[in-house]
């Protein structure tokens, strides 16, 4: 579905139950591609979009999930604690590898970049710092409140981000509140 945009790049996977990512634009897409992660259903897609005389690369990414339920109970015993720690350690290792692949791809890009995606990690993480680099966090530029994008039972978490180059002005940022886990 094009959602009334003139151009799109859609990358779908799966058989009967499809999943994937898409980039929609009112401006012409002149190139597109994907960064595939080894042994993962997660990935990054990108599109080079022309507006006037400027070309920018837009990335959409979905990194490894940490697989923690939003319904965390107050009482966690030692066994459950070890299980959660193991799951986090495994996910963070995979995310680190994914972030480093993405960073390498950024280095070869000659256009200004806009990066959008689900990092499945906090703004205090290695993954966030690696992918953000010297770019601006759009929420920090123009957002308000917690900016939550994942609604844990006892606290909000921001795991989805938009980063832009210094030469791109962030005029507005809205967090969509209708999505619930």
Where is each model-derived feature located?
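A solvent-exposed, charged loop/short amphipathic helix patch at secondary-structure junctions
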Residues: 72-88
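Structured beta-strand-rich core segments of catalytic domains in phosphoester-bond hydrolases
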Residues: 2-69, 162, 169, 174-177
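Extracytoplasmic/periplasmic, Sec-exported soluble proteins
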Residues: 12-16, 39, 87-94, 119-123, ...
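Metal-dependent phosphoester-hydrolase catalytic domains
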Residues: 104-113, 119-181
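Active-site metal-binding loops of divalent metal-dependent hydrolases
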Residues: 63, 118-119
